Amino acid sequence: MMKIYLMGSDQRIVRCARVSFAKDSYVDEKRDKRLIRYLFKHRHASPFEHNIIAFEWKKEKWIELLSKLENPTVQVYYSNGFVFLNLRNAINVWELLPDAVKERIKEAFPTTYGVIQRRGEIEDEELYSLPYTKDKAYVKEKIETSSGWIGLVDKLELETDMDFYTFVVECPLFVARQWMRHRFGSYNEVSKRYVGKEFLEFYLPKYIRKQAEKNKQASVDEPISESEVFIKKIENLISKSVKLYEEIIEKGGAKELARGVLPQFMKTRFYWTVPRISLDNFITLRTHEGAQKEIREFAEAIKEMVGYRGTDKKNVI
């Protein structure tokens, strides 16, 4: 019998979509089901990338599947006897998947399976009658850092280089932008086009660190002189920026433009689903002493939660 493993749920798709509105903990089954249908019909595909499918297969079968692909955007990976792909890619190669895999998808993501089968053209009555799977908890483990927090949402570990993990992260914008340079993975993030002052938090460091003398991009963990004065000025700048932001919104200004006045200390939240080989690369680079302190703390937290295996060393660069 084929070994098949899945990570995620119907709700996982909804969470990764609703994070755009900072409402990823909100649950309403009927609305959730309608949202899955809406995402599918309107080709909002990224939330489907956080559900992962792995099944045992011979490498020859995987190569045969790849040879039949006509869509160059589809990504299907092979590692240590298992095929890995996310649900978005599975939908795009649906006719090539083994029937047993489709049956497991039906069991694990029943609402989503119903939507896939109807290509989104499913009426409310039938949609509401479908089972709906939920995550057992918002996070399995959570670690606070000086600038935010990270939670382990889920993991699929088969002792391969392509084991998968999903995290939810809250951090300053400048940390998120560094984070998203790690491109082998999937992201969904709070959008300030949608969310106004209901999600408006800022990171304020305890002190302003000194610039490193020999490393142009690094700092020394010592306060500069008059650090307290500058921290106070930053607080004032944040306060003035928020006031201006709110004034623009109150006058009917678009949030997508008003957000431009908010400083980089503003926090964001995002979901990150990542394979082990990319995760290990993140840990290697971001625990280095030259990495920024704030993101280094997150990398150390990840290492504490799921360990480091060194799979990234297989890459030359």
Swiss-Prot record:
Write out the entry's keywords from A to Z.
FAD, Flavoprotein, Methyltransferase, NADP, Nucleotide biosynthesis, Transferase
Co-factor: note: Binds 4 FAD per tetramer. Each FAD binding site is formed by three monomers.
Q: Specify whether Hydrolase is a keyword of the entry.
A: no
- Catalyses which reaction(s): dUMP + (6R)-5,10-methylene-5,6,7,8-tetrahydrofolate + NADPH + H(+) = dTMP + (6S)-5,6,7,8-tetrahydrofolate + NADP(+)
The cofactor required is: FAD
**Residues that coordinate or bind dUMP:** 178-181, 189-193, 259, 286
Report domain ThyX positions: 100-317
Q: Which residues bind FAD?
A: 46, 181-183, 189, 281
EC main group: transferase
Ranges spanned by the short sequence motif ThyX motif, renumbered to the chain: 181-191
Specify whether Coiled coil is a keyword of the entry: no
Q: In which pathway does it act?
A: Pyrimidine metabolism; dTTP biosynthesis
The segment annotated Insert runs over 55-166
Q: Pfam families attached here?
A: Thy1
Q: Where is the active site?
A: 286 (involved in ionization of n3 of dump, leading to its activation)
Which GO terms are recorded in the biological process aspect for this UniProt protein?
A: dTMP biosynthetic process; dTTP biosynthetic process; methylation
Check the record and name the PROSITE patterns matching this protein: THYX
What the entry lists under NCBIfam families is as follows:
thyX
Its annotated function is as follows: Catalyzes the reductive methylation of 2'-deoxyuridine-5'-monophosphate (dUMP) to 2'-deoxythymidine-5'-monophosphate (dTMP) while utilizing 5,10-methylenetetrahydrofolate (mTHF) as the methyl donor, and NADPH and FADH(2) as the reductant.
**Assembly and binders:** Homotetramer.
What name appears for this protein in its UniProt entry?
Flavin-dependent thymidylate synthase
Q: Which organism is it from?
A: Aquifex aeolicus (strain VF5)
Q: Which gene encodes it?
A: thyX
